Amino acid sequence: MTMETVESQHDGSITASLTESKSAHVQTQTGQNSIPALAQVSVAGSGTRRGSPAVTLVQLPSGQTIHVQGVIQTPQPWVIQSSEIHTVQVAAIAETDESAESEGVIDSHKRREILSRRPSYRKILNELSSDVPGVPKIEEERSEEEGTPPSIATMAVPTSIYQTSTGQYIAIAQGGTIQISNPGSDGVQGLQALTMTNSGAPPPGATIVQYAAQSADGTQQFFVPGSQVVVQDEETELAPSHMAAATGDMPTYQIRAPTAALPQGVVMAASPGSLHSPQQLAEEATRKRELRLMKNREAAKECRRRKKEYVKCLESRVAVLEVQNKKLIEELETLKDICSPKTDY
């Protein structure tokens, strides 16, 4: 058998040659070693290319060797590698998601612990107010509403706290309630509640302030932000010269004794503009004109006095200069007398 016939058989049917070689090899094994081996088959794989088919070497009894290309191909390794890479990526993503969730849970726990350890504003305010005597401490009040969490406490904080010259502390709440604390009192027990009410009986522009009690001397003075009311004893009536004037941007208010229509313990305070009638305005204009004329007369007197002093100063200077002039004239005459005989010789 030549190489051309083997190659033609290989081109015709590779499968038939393989089956024949396998059957011949089986016959050699079962023939009790009486018949010599027909062919010796050895399989060798070519590693030149990735994924190339294996080559079978068939040795005939005559000593010829035939290269037969196998039909069965080796599995492609890239398929397994791609699947492995895919599984690794998915596992990494799952791990990152789990780690992110665990970190988020840890951060939320830490934040809750920090918030629970943080001191409340009421505690800070109570510590600050405990240093100053007479400042009322803010008490915590638990809210009874269903929607409010139990850890949240509500309190009524005054909008502003003022201290008078006598040492009293005045707290004005948002609802218009005024609380007065004496210097010797401690906490909320020394506070006096005042309620601002409006009435139609007083003239427009007036503000009514009602207070519960009075101090030992019977006089109370404090400032109310917004209306700027100055409250004093209800039995006293202030004259225009004793009008309570507030400093800064706070206007002046005059306190009048309560009328019969007002209840006991109510003081009416009105601004000066609302109390002026046309007659009072005319009197005020006359008073201002007289005051201006008086100031002009005083200024004219001062100007005349200064002019007289200036004239006297000038007269004294003229007298001094006249004396000096006379002395100079006498000296000049003496010099002339001394120099005249020398010129004659």
Swiss-Prot record:
Where do the KID domain residues begin and end? 88-147
Chief location bin = nucleus
Write out the tissue specificity statement of the associated record.
Expressed in testes (round spermatids) (at protein level). Isoform 14 is the major activator form in testes.
Q: Which Gene3D superfamilies match?
A: 1.20.5.170
Q: Where is this protein localized, as stated in its record?
A: Nucleus
Annotated CDD domains: bZIP_CREB1
Any one GO molecular function term:
RNA polymerase II cis-regulatory region sequence-specific DNA binding
Its quaternary organisation is:
Binds DNA as a dimer. Interacts with FHL5. Interacts with CDC34. May interact with TSSK4.
Give the protein's recorded name: cAMP-responsive element modulator
Native organism = Homo sapiens
**Lineage, highest ranks first:** Eukaryota, Metazoa, Chordata, Craniata, Vertebrata
Gene behind the chain: CREM
